[in-house]
UniProtKB/Swiss-Prot annotation:
The gene is RPL26. Keywords: Ribonucleoprotein, Ribosomal protein. The keyword Ribosomal protein applies. It comes from the Eukaryota. This is Large ribosomal subunit protein uL24.
Length: 14
């Protein structure tokens, strides 16, 4: 994952 784990979680929620 290039972004942080927090960002990844946010993308999944989107």
């Amino acid at each position: 994952m290039k972004y942080n784990p927090r960002v990844s979680s946010n993308r999944r929620k989107s």
